[in-house]
Structures are given as structure tokens and as C-alpha cells.
């Protein structure tokens, strides 16, 4: 019998600069608020309606350090973690909070370019027109890369035939769609 799955995937916008702190053992912990929005058309009024949901995200370890260094208010990111509810008592009243935990099994990816007003520094993520990672998304997994066992080579492999260079895609300026993002 399966024990269940606890997995949360969010793509959203940071609502404030991340808060980084360090535990006594030296491990980093970063807390941030991530906003996700959904939009729909009200059937009665025909007006577009948008609802924003705020999520508490706590990152641990190396991914916490990276988030603290590169995420800022307005940054877009992809978060993959697990849902966790904490309970504590304050003034005799039980309180609860639910948050997304990104630990060794989680993932954080920086998306899009730098937020407006952020300084253009000399860091490695300031290449390719201001996009993080030179226009490509950077993924930060906590898990170390898997080592694959070396198989003995049975026969020399022939080089693959040369493929023709890819041609640029068609012009999509006239493409009109009703996608809400």
C-alpha cells in the first residue's frame, strides 16, 4: 500500500526580498512569500477576475543560499517542495501555519529576467540580456548528481551523421491566442 505523495509545484513571483538566516550548525534557511495568480472571466458580468494566493516558502541548505543571493522582490521562480503544517502555542492559543518546504529533495529554478530597478552587476547571472543564466533557466537541486556505473565498451561507436542546421521558426507576430499569461 502506498504511503502517499506530498509534492507541491509553484510558479510565482516573490512578494518581498527573501529573508536569509543561519542555523547554529551553519546551514542556511531562507523564507520568502511567493504569489501565484489565476484569472478567469465571470460568467454573469463578463468581467475578468483575478485571484492572487500567497504562499510561505522555506528553503534549506545550498538552495537557500542561492535563493537569498539571487531572488529579489518581483523575481519569478519555480518551486518544487512538500507541504508542511507547523503548530505552536502563543498566549495560550494554538496557532498553525502551512508552508512549502524546499529541502534536499526539492528544487528551485530562477525564471525570467531581473526585476525592474535591480542593479546590473558583474555576477555570472548577468549575461544574455539580463536573464538569469544567459537566457536559460538555472535549476538548483539539493540532491547530488547520480553516478552511473561504467559499462565496458563492446565496439567502437561510429560518429553520428551531421544534421542540417535548424532553421529559424516561422514569424509568430500575427499569432493571437487567448492564453491568460
Swiss-Prot record:
Residues 5-109 form the SSB domain. Residues 158-167 have a biased composition (Pro residues). Residues 127-136 have a biased composition (Gly residues). A motif (Important for interaction with partner proteins) lies at residues 176-181. CDD domains: SSB_OBF (cd04496). InterPro entries: NA-bd_OB-fold, Primosome_PriB/ssb, ssDNA-bd. Keywords: DNA damage, DNA recombination, DNA repair, DNA replication, DNA-binding. It holds the Pfam family SSB. The keyword DNA-binding applies. GO terms for biological process: DNA recombination; DNA repair; DNA replication. Residues 111-181 are annotated as: Disordered. One of its GO terms (molecular function) is single-stranded DNA binding. Residues 112-126, 137-157 have a biased composition (Low complexity). One of its GO terms (cellular component) is nucleoid. The keyword DNA-binding applies. Homotetramer. Plays an important role in DNA replication, recombination and repair. Binds to ssDNA and to an array of partner proteins to recruit them to their sites of action during DNA metabolism. NCBIfam families: PRK05733.1, ssb. This is Single-stranded DNA-binding protein. It comes from Pseudomonas putida (strain ATCC 47054 / DSM 6125 / CFBP 8728 / NCIMB 11950 / KT2440). The lineage of its organism: Bacteria, Pseudomonadati, Pseudomonadota, Gammaproteobacteria, Pseudomonadales.
Amino acid at each position: 500500500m502506498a504511503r502517499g505523495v506530498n509534492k507541491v509545484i509553484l510558479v510565482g513571483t516573490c512578494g518581498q526580498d527573501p529573508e536569509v538566516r543561519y542555523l547554529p550548525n551553519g546551514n542556511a534557511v531562507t523564507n520568502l512569500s511567493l504569489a501565484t495568480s489565476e484569472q478567469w472571466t465571470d460568467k454573469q458580468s463578463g468581467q475578468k477576475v483575478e485571484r492572487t494566493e500567497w504562499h510561505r516558502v522555506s528553503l534549506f541548505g545550498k538552495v537557500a543560499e542561492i535563493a537569498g543571493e539571487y531572488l529579489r522582490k518581483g523575481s519569478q521562480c519555480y518551486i518544487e517542495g512538500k507541504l508542511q503544517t507547523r503548530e505552536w502555542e502563543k498566549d495560550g492559543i494554538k496557532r498553525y501555519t502551512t508552508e512549502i518546504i524546499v529541502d534536499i529533495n526539492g528544487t528551485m529554478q530562477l525564471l525570467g529576467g531581473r526585476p525592474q530597478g535591480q542593479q546590473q552587476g558583474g555576477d555570472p547571472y548577468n549575461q544574455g540580456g539580463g536573464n538569469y543564466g544567459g537566457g536559460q533557466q538555472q535549476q538548483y537541486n539539493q540532491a547530488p548528481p547520480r553516478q552511473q556505473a561504467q559499462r565496458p565498451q563492446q565496439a567502437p561507436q561510429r560518429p553520428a551523421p551531421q544534421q542540417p542546421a535548424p532553421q529559424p521558426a516561422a514569424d509568430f507576430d500575427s499569432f493571437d491566442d487567448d492564453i491568460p499569461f
